Amino acid sequence: MNLREKYGEWGLILGATEGVGKAFCEKIAAGGMNVVMVGRREEKLNVLAGEIRETYGVETKVVRADFSQPGAAETVFAATEGLDMGFMSYVACLHSFGKIQDTPWEKHEAMINVNVVTFLKCFHHYMRIFAAQDRGAVINVSSMTGISSSPWNGQYGAGKAFILKMTEAVACECEGTGVDVEVITLGTTLTPSLLSNLPGGPQGEAVMKIALTPEECVDEAFEKLGKELSVIAGQRNKDSVHDWKANHTEDEYIRYMGSFYRD
């Protein structure tokens, strides 16, 4: 698909440095779009930007922003002003393991800013642009933790639930227009963060067998864009959600999700 012809000249990836964000950068560049890449680690972004320019022959723009800090969204808006924007994906996330009372408020506030406030500011801003021009696309990234809840990782799951439900609603509102909106919900994904914390032995091998690559997740997201409002990445994840909803109570599902994070 020529994404540039369909949606516009520039795409914006929020949380672009590695993993799923990097895969989104490569995907839209392969579709002919120039890429605005936003993240905290400017040096890594510059390396990725150079690779994308060389491989795909598109323009890139690197923006350093910490989504946990006030003003981060406004930094992004200023960097994209005047560009022909046609795509946005919010990939960034922040989590902290532990009980609500054991997590410092400052950490809670940072997670709210990343997972809710900056997300919504960016979604609102670029949806206004896309709606006004009746052209554009959004793919936001949620998590299986947002489908049920995520004990001992509670605020992360709640934030992902917000992204999931907010994007689903907007996707429905956009049906029949020139703007395509979708949320993709990810399960275990082979990101650098996962690989660096992967346990050894049979447990690690089991994770590797079920995990999807970032590229597989992004490919499925684009395959379903404009066709489905809400996508669960991978057949195994789809089957798992269907099984738990059909054959278990909500309490059982909550306790099951908590078993992944409880000490």
Curated annotation (Swiss-Prot):
Active site positions, chain numbering: Y156
Enzymatic reactions: a 7beta-hydroxysteroid + NADP(+) = a 7-oxosteroid + NADPH + H(+); 7-oxolithocholate + NADPH + H(+) = ursodeoxycholate + NADP(+); 7beta-hydroxy-3,12-dioxo-5beta-cholan-24-oate + NADP(+) = dehydrocholate + NADPH + H(+); ursocholate + NADP(+) = 3alpha,12alpha-dihydroxy-7-oxo-5beta-cholanate + NADPH + H(+)
Gene Ontology BP annotations: bile acid catabolic process; lipid catabolic process
Induction: Is expressed constitutively and repressed by ursodeoxycholate.
Site (Transition state stabilizer): S143
One of the Pfam families matching this protein, by short name: adh_short
GO molecular function: 7-beta-hydroxysteroid dehydrogenase (NADP+) activity; nucleotide binding
InterPro entries listed in its UniProt record: NAD(P)-bd_dom_sf (IPR036291), SDR_fam (IPR002347), VLCFA-Steroid_DH (IPR051019)
EC number(s) per entry: 1.1.1.201
Annotated site, Lowers pKa of active site Tyr, chain positions: K160
Applied value in biotechnology: Could be a useful biocatalyst for the preparative production of ursodeoxycholate, an FDA-approved cholic acid derivate drug used to treat cholesterol gallstones and current sole alternative to surgical intervention.
Domain of life of the native organism: Bacteria
Thermal effects: Is not very thermostable. The enzyme is completely inactivated at 50 degrees Celsius within 5 minutes and at 40 degrees Celsius within 400 minutes.
Alphabetized UniProt keyword annotations: Bile acid catabolism, Lipid degradation, Lipid metabolism, NADP, Nucleotide-binding, Oxidoreductase, Steroid metabolism
pH dependence: Optimum pH is 9-10 for the oxidation of ursodeoxycholate. Optimum pH is 4-6 for the reduction of 7-oxo-LCA and dehydrocholate.
Signal peptide range: none
Residues given in the record as NADP(+) binding sites: T17, E18, G19, V20, G21, R40, R41, D66, F67, S240
Domain-related comment: The 27 C-terminal residues (residues 237-263) are absolutely required for enzymatic activity; a deletion mutant lacking this C-terminal region shows a complete absence of enzymatic activity.
Family: Belongs to the short-chain dehydrogenases/reductases (SDR) family.
Assembly information from the UniProt record: Homodimer.
Biological role stated in the UniProt entry: 7beta-hydroxysteroid dehydrogenase that catalyzes the reduction of the 7-oxo group of 7-oxo-lithocholate (7-oxo-LCA), to yield ursodeoxycholate (UDCA). As C.aerofaciens is an intestinal bacterium, this enzyme probably contributes to the formation of UDCA in the human colon. UDCA is regarded as a chemopreventive beneficial secondary bile acid due to its low hydrophobicity; it protects hepatocytes and bile duct epithelial cells against necrosis and apoptosis induced by more hydrophobic secondary bile acids like deoxycholate (DCA). This enzyme is also able to catalyze the reverse reaction, i.e.
Name assigned to this protein: 7beta-hydroxysteroid dehydrogenase
